[in-house]
Regions:
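Extended carbohydrate-recognition surfaces in non-catalytic/accessory domains of CAZymes
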Residues: 20-124, 180-200, 208-209, 605, ...
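Accessory beta-strand-rich segments of carbohydrate-active enzymes
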Residues: 32-34, 76, 96-212, 236-237, ...
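Beta-strand-rich binding/interaction modules
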Residues: 134-136, 226-262, 268-270, 653-692, ...
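Extended acidic/polar, glycine-enriched regions
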Residues: 160-164, 235-311, 705, 712-743
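N-terminal carbohydrate-binding accessory modules
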Residues: 292-354, 735
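Substrate-binding/catalytic cleft of secreted carbohydrate-active enzymes
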Residues: 361-615, 820
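Catalytic beta-strand/loop cores that center a nucleophilic Ser/Cys/Thr
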Residues: 501-503, 776-781, 796-894, 912-950
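Short alpha-beta junction capping motif
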Residues: 748-794, 873-876, 903, 950
């Protein structure tokens, strides 16, 4: 009966409330760009100048919004053809057809109904870029410059109802007034591009001038089962006292109302009592309420969720439950349009893909997305960290008296006002990697934002490891505790970042606070690159074209490797996936680590072309790891194995502890661990099942130890350990067992040396066999630095900082690998001994169609043909030369020992019959010639390469 009267009251109060009337202004507008408005052209909105084909043709002299740390494009001879008119292509980011920075002028005639007389009339512009100045019938209505939120103009005093009215917009997309920094993802040509236009809703709206509801904010109080609703209402009359707030669950089964608001000035405060059937919002059960506030003849609609975020020590809590962040960075890369979508469907697809890959959070790097992103995340159960639209660096500094100081705080409050009701909006940072005396500024920003809206948690800035520690941040997004140490030490899965949680880089202990006690999320974890997928090129059918990929494809073709493109993609991609797996697992097994933010699940189009995603920029899978495979190590429940190493001798006994990371919705009751070890044929070496008991939410739950004597394994064998909680989670790890064998020595029929010396020449002339172990000796290729780990981000942005290679392609059809050295066709972990910091040979003087059976994959910006082993008929003899170290410390390097023995066995077999004919001078050139160093033609560099970063 009580509910009946509540509903009756709602009906009584809402009777006679007219819907706000709207005129859609999308469609054709008169248009021009330049110094003065002439309106001699037309354009379609929503859209940008670029999507309409407007602007200046791009050429080699186009001034871009963004930093360039590699200017070689403008000087290299092999780039000259891409600087020619009609064939403009850029290697450092996607290529648009047009570019323009300046004023653009838009005008439209609109018939305004007579019955709008006496009403309040507003203009709504969703996602204009950047500054708008509005004129109505020739009179200025105002100016706004938000990069993140809609521009709203009150045109009541300028619109003439019953007449045709002229609405004109001047839109300016220069960045000097917003002062956010040229590499901010809100403006830079590295990502979305610095476009000019309006890309979301464009409309005129009429409403009552009385009881104008400007905004409604909702503050959930989960503990007390209440939601506090604050409505800003101006020009109130007596009807304001009869205002009502109505919350409705997503399934329409629950309706909660609040009447008789507390009126304090322009603020109406309602208390919604959610009751015992209150539905909370989180990643597992994203329950959403719609809210409608009625005051007089006006209404305001929004959404909210009963969601509380808090911090307890190192942990985030959502509604009182520990929550671990598995995030990716959204970089505002949308090649088809050049701007973020304003429709919910597009974002729903992105977030569904994130969930498919076990991701529960997205950080928006130096920008804030449109409202559609928040709405889609609400429904998907994805946590969001928008940022102030600024990377205040590379010409802009915080706390230095620049306009950014004022703009960033104002814009942050606008973001919270516009999108703060969305339950997915759980955290926020001021921006990315600031310059200047930024810590005092960001500390003030955090405290100001906490006071402004405490329904979120705040971080001063998302920063790399070299940046200072900002003490007021409620949580920290910080680099330093990320990456893998495999360029310096052999791979394992037994290390973690525990020490860096207590004493992060640049944390300054005090007597009051000797250690850090706040949550840390890894900043931009990953950045492992794979080779370009040239099959992707036809997908760029919109505003931006993958001309950078076309350049990289040409480089590969010009260097005789066109047919290697797909092999390079797959081999480098599998190594990339492996690196992501073990870095993510390292984070998950670190006590007190609150989570990670990957850079990124999908590719980044700019900054030199950073192909660091296992998905392309369109969020499509590239083909070398599936979502279920990825989710084994990136999910709410993950079994983890602590391998001390991944290569064993058959005289070893395997002993690997298993632990469980549980970030699910609750305790895993009566858990059972099942594990087995198999080889490629499916043969079981062990198979066990054991009860584990209850596993609470948290990390480092010990589940048992896998033990296996390896003595019975006589041949080189790859084994797989699989551990699972049946029906809940599964993970697997590959490891290798090699025989504890003697070091083979060359017989009388093979001359082994480290150079093409005179004896080698003589042996070859006599038709003999020569093995040259040239590790550390070659000069032709010495400028290419190889690590086991692949390129970080890309060599263009980081000015050829090593490593320069992205893995190695292994030709498994080569006889060497048939029996004596079984292998994958990529550099899996058993190759670490042979590849890490090993020299490569530059094969530029060999025939164009020759490919080494062990072929390191060079940076796609150069694509030198490389090799670590060549075979040739020289002077009638048979030569095999390798830069793998198969000579030193072989008692402790069992893979190198096996490779040495395998090579000697191969050279003694009938399979060793090189068809490539080389002159001795060509072989000798590997020891004498050098290629000139790659020049960047600029002294500018990213922050990470600057020695005194703060």
């Amino acid at each position: 009966m009580k509910n009946y009267f509540s509903i009756l009251l709602i009906l009584m109060l809402t009777t006679g409330i007219s819907a706000r009337e709207t005129i859609d202004l999308s469609g054709k507008w008169m248009f021009n760009f330049g110094d003065t408005p002439t309106y001699n052209d037309s354009i379609v909105l929503p859209g940008s100048m670029l999507t309409n084909g407007k602007g200046h043709d791009v050429d080699a002299n186009t001034k871009w919004t963004g930093s360039l740390y590699d200017m070689s494009y403008y000087y290299r001879d092999d780039m000259a053809k891409y600087r020619e008119k009609g064939n403009i292509k850029f290697p450092f980011f996607l290529t648009p057809d047009k570019s323009y920075v300046g004023n653009a002028y838009y005008k439209k005639s609109v018939d305004i109904p007579k019955d709008w007389k006496g009403k309040r009339i507003t203009l709504h512009l969703e996602r204009p870029h950047i500054e708008t100045t509005i004129y109505v019938n020739g009179k200025e209505a105002g100016h706004q410059m938000s990069l993140s939120t809609p521009h709203e103009y009150d045109l009541t005093d300028l619109i003439i109802p019953g007449k045709t009215n002229e609405i004109a917009m001047t839109i300016y997309n220069g960045i000097e007034n917003v002062c956010v920094g040229q590499d901010s993802h809100s403006v830079t040509d590295q990502t979305q591009g610095n476009w000019n236009g309006v890309v979301g809703e464009i409309s005129l709206k009429a409403s009552s001038p009385k009881n104008v509801i400007h905004n409604v904010r909702v503050y959930p109080d989960v503990a007390n089962k209440q939601a506090v609703v604050k409505a800003i209402v101006t020009n109130q009359n007596g009807k304001a006292k009869k205002s009502v707030a109505i919350a409705t669950s997503s399934d329409k089964q629950s309706v909660i109302t609040a009447t008789k608001p507390i009126i304090t000035g322009d603020t109406l405060t309602f208390i919604l009592n959610m009751g015992d059937k209150m539905r909370t919002w989180d990643e597992f059960n994203p329950e959403i309420y719609s809210l409608k506030v009625n005051s007089g003849e006006n209404s305001f609609e929004t959404v909210f969720g009963m969601r509380n975020i808090s911090i307890d020590g190192y942990d985030f809590h959502i509604n009182g439950r520990p929550t671990y962040i598995r995030g990716t960075v959204g970089n505002c890369c949308f090649p088809l349009t050049g701007y973020p979508p304003t429709d919910e469907e597009s974002w729903a697809k992105i977030f569904a893909t994130c969930k498919e890959y076990g991701i529960n959070m997205m950080r928006f790097h130096s920008y804030c997305p449109p409202e559609a992103a928040f709405s889609a995340a609400d429904k998907a159960g994805v946590y969001l960290q928008p940022e102030g639209p600024s990377w205040p660096n590379h010409g802009v500094k915080l706390n230095a008296g620049m306009d950014i100081d004022r703009y960033l705080l104002e814009e942050s409050k606008r973001i919270v006002d516009s999108y703060g009701n969305h339950p997915s909006f759980v955290m926020m940072a001021a921006g990315n990697e600031p310059a200047g005396n930024w810590v005092p500024y960001c500390n003030r920003w955090v405290n100001e934002m906490k006071n402004y809206d405490n329904s979120k948690v705040y971080c001063g800035a998302s920063v790399g490891g070299g940046w200072a520690w900002d003490s007021e941040s409620e949580y920290h997004v910080k680099g330093g505790a990320r990456g893998l140490t495999w360029s310096k030490s052999r791979p394992s899965s037994d290390d973690d970042f525990a020490a860096e949680m207590k004493l992060p880089r640049n944390f300054k202990p005090t007597e009051e606070k000797p250690i850090n006690t706040s949550p840390i999320l890894s900043h931009e974890q990953g950045q492992w690159c794979a080779f370009p997928d040239f099959k992707e090129i036809p997908k760029y059918t919109g505003a931006y074209k993958a001309k950078n990929f076309e350049i990289f494809r040409d480089l590969l073709r010009n260097n005789g490797m066109e047919e290697m493109a797909e092999k390079f993609l797959m081999s480098s991609g599998k190594l990339q996936s492996l690196c992501y797996k073990y870095e993510i697992e390292r984070n998950l097994r670190t006590p007190d680590y609150s989570g990670f933010q990957l850079l990124a699940l999908n590719d980044y189009s700019g900054q030199g072309t950073a192909l660091e995603g296992v998905l392309n920029v369109f969020w499509d899978n590239k083909g070398y790891i599936t979502a279920p495979e990825w989710k084994e190590f990136c999910s709410e429940i993950v079994p983890l194995a602590r391998f001390p190493k991944f290569v064993f001798s058959n005289s070893d006994t395997l002993s690997v502890p298993i632990e469980i990371m549980n970030a699910s919705a609750g305790t895993i009751e009566n858990a059972v661990l099942r594990y087995d070890i198999t080889d490629a044929s499916g043969k079981y070496y062990c198979k066990e099942e054991k009860p584990v008991g209850d596993i609470a939410i948290g990390k480092n739950h010990q589940a048992g130890v896998v033990n296996l004597p390896l003595a019975g394994i006589e041949n080189p064998t790859k084994l797989t350990l699989t551990a699972e909680l049946p029906g809940k989670a599964k993970n697997h790890w590959e490891f290798w067992v090699y025989p504890d064998e003697k070091i083979s020595m060359p017989g009388d029929n093979i001359y082994m040396t480290d150079s093409l010396d005179s004896k080698a020449i003589e042996v070859l002339k006599q038709g003999g066999k020569v093995l040259i172990t040239a590790a550390g000796k070659v000069t032709l290729g010495s400028d290419v630095v190889q690590h086991y780990l692949p390129v970080f981000w890309n060599t263009s942005w980081f000015k050829m900082r090593p490593p320069h290679t992205t893995g190695t392609y292994i030709d498994t059809n080569h006889p060497l690998f048939k029996n004596n050295f079984p292998t994958d066709d990529w550099s899996n972990l058993n190759w670490w001994e042979l590849l890490n910091r090993a020299q490569v040979m530059n094969l530029l003087e060999l025939p164009a169609d020759y490919q080494s059976p062990i072929q390191p994959i060079d940076t796609w910006h150069v694509s030198r043909k490389l090799g670590m082993m060549i075979e040739a008929n020289v002077l009638g003899g048979k030569l095999l030369m390798t830069t793998m170290d198969i000579d030193r410390n072989l008692d402790n390097r069992i893979v190198a020992r096996r490779m040495r023995n395998a090579i000697l066995d191969y050279m003694n077999s009938d399979d060793f019959n090189p068809q490539l004919v080389l002159a001795p001078e060509t072989v000798g050139n590997f020891f004498t010639k050098q290629t000139p160093p790659i020049q960047m033609y600029t002294n500018e560099s990213p922050d990470e390469l600057k020695p005194k970063l703060k």
